[in-house]
Amino acid sequence: MPGKELSDPCVDCRDAEAILTLRRRRLCKDCYIKFVSYKVFKRMENYRLNRGFAKDKPCKLLFPLSYGLSSSVLLHMLHDQLEVQRSKVHGSPGFDLHVLIIEPSTISPSNPAHDEGFELAQKCFPLCSFTKVPFHSIFALVPDIKETMSQFAGKGFEDDPSLSDAERLNAFRSCIATSTSKADVDHILMNRLIVAFAKQMDCQAIIWGDSDSRLAAKTLANVAKGRGSSVIWQVSDGMSPFGLEFNFPLRDLFTAELRDYASFFPELTKLIVPDEPLPANTLTKNLSIDELMMRYVLTQGEKYPGVMLNVTRTANKLDVSQMPANLSHCTFCAAPLMNEVGGGHTQFCYACARSRPSTSS
């Protein structure tokens, strides 16, 4: 008996109706998931096969989860890989994944605590281990950060040891003047917290959940802010200045493609906290450079996805080995100091100097 004729067959399997267009190809649900997941599968190959790591034990990886679309989708894909890895009796040790969550409400009071998301993640991804920490735990994880903050803020900030860690962190953050500087400083502090936690857990690498769209925006924003030298490790796979590998498995996938993937899984819909859309009438001067670049990439990326993909691919070709040896590094962000002149007891890179309260504008 002949099978039912399909009006719009999937171009890959030819056995099911196509429901989505992926890069000009009409695919069914299963083939769409397979295509998107394979992009991440290939990017995780070195960790799955323990290339460059001990062969007798799993490679320990840290994964920061923000409850955003990209990191939530990536966690779902990585857990699928863990399930396959554990099902193989004689396979390589592969990797273990520890998930770190910085409590959203401690980053901004406008962010929901999302405690139900933490419980849901533990339930949906049982092969991962989880830790949740507040933003101000940076003081415990990075012991010298208090002195660094005081030097960074200069005379415009006076640390009060009688305050709680949360209050001290908020006091420091509130002395940063502009929206761009605030976003820049917050990103650096969160990055240092995550790196310090990864080292405490004896992890070999950090897996970041940035999509191609996010990496393109990050590249453009970093160059605009004067952080061109840090693009190498902020958007490229490889060794970071912190002695840990950074890896971005979603670099070949667009935000829109991740959104379609998430729509197939109800648990992801419950886990993801959607980004609040910026009002169309928001004044440009009230936006940070990071927000401006993300808005630009999301709007132009829909029209010219290939251009945004080239931005990320070009940045990924930067070779950290071509950097001059024996460079000193910025005390605040760890970027290599090229031509900067240090002052006082420490040195800050050009971009950090611009973000300091005494110089930001």
Curated annotation (Swiss-Prot):
Extract the HAMAP family matched here: CTU2 (MF_03054)
- Looking at the keywords, is Cytoplasm present? yes
Q: What is its main location?
A: cytoplasm
Look up the domain of life of the source: Eukaryota
The record's family statement is: Belongs to the CTU2/NCS2 family.
- Per the record, the gene is ncs2
- Identify the species of origin: Aspergillus oryzae (strain ATCC 42149 / RIB 40) (Yellow koji mold)
Q: What is one cellular component GO term in this UniProt entry?
A: cytosol
Which pathway does this chain act in? tRNA modification; 5-methoxycarbonylmethyl-2-thiouridine-tRNA biosynthesis
Protein name listed in UniProt: Cytoplasmic tRNA 2-thiolation protein 2
Cite the GO molecular-function annotations of the record: nucleotidyltransferase activity; sulfurtransferase activity; tRNA binding
